[in-house]
Amino acid sequence: MDRLKQSLLDAPVIEKEEYQYFVHPISDGVPMLRPELLREIVIRIIRKAELEDVDKIVTPAAMGIHISTAVSLMTDIPLVVIRKRQYGLEGEVSLQQVTGYSESEMYVNDVYEGDKVLVLDDVLSTGGTLAGITGALEEIGAEIVDIVAVIKKVGGENKIDDSDFDVKTLINVDVEDMEVIIVDEQGDG
C-alpha cells in the first residue's frame, strides 16, 4: 500500500463549522511530514504533470509551499508563491480565495503575460483557491500548462468544475462519518 493512501486512511478527522476536515501532513503540517511521504508525492507529481515548456511553478501559501519547493528542486523550475500578505510591489495582482470554511485575499507577483505555469496545490475541495488562482493568472495573461493537486476531496460543490481547467490529482477521497474513504487511488488525469 502506498504511503499517501495509508497516511490518508490514518488521518484524524475534525468537524469545523459542520464541515468534516481531515488533518494531514500535506494539507496541515500535522502530524509531521515524513520525507518518504513527501518524496513519493513529488515523484508522482513529476510523472503526472505536464512539465515541458513550464517556466514557473505557482502555488498558494502556505501548504502548497513544501510540495512545490521539492518539485522545483527536482525539476529546476522556479517557484512563485501566492501569498496572503500584500507588499505593494509593481505588478502585484490580488485574487479572492473562497473555500468551504474561509474567505481571504491573496497576492501574486513575478508572473507575467506569456509565462507558462504549472499550478500546484495540496488539496482540491471546494475549488475556491484554484478558481481564484486561475482567474488571476488568466487576468495576467499567463498560460496555465497544467494544474495538479495532491488530494481531491470529492462531494459537494467544486468551483473549478465550472471552468475550462482539468485538475490532475494523485488520489481522491471523501470524508464520511468522520472517516477518510479512498474513492480513487489513482486520482484524476
Curated annotation (Swiss-Prot):
Domain of life: Archaea
EC number(s) per entry: 2.4.2.-
Gene3D superfamilies: 3.40.50.2020
Enzyme class: transferase
Entry-linked InterPro entries: HGPRTase-like (IPR026597), PRibTrfase_dom (IPR000836), PRTase-like (IPR029057), Pur/Pyrimidine_PRTase (IPR050118)
Record carries keyword Cell cycle: no
Keywords: Purine salvage, Transferase
GO MF annotation list: transferase activity
Family: Belongs to the purine/pyrimidine phosphoribosyltransferase family. Archaeal HPRT subfamily.
Role played: May catalyze a purine salvage reaction, the substrate is unknown.
Cited PANTHER family: HYPOXANTHINE/GUANINE PHOSPHORIBOSYLTRANSFERASE, XANTHINE PHOSPHORIBOSYLTRANSFERASE
Protein name: HGPRTase-like protein
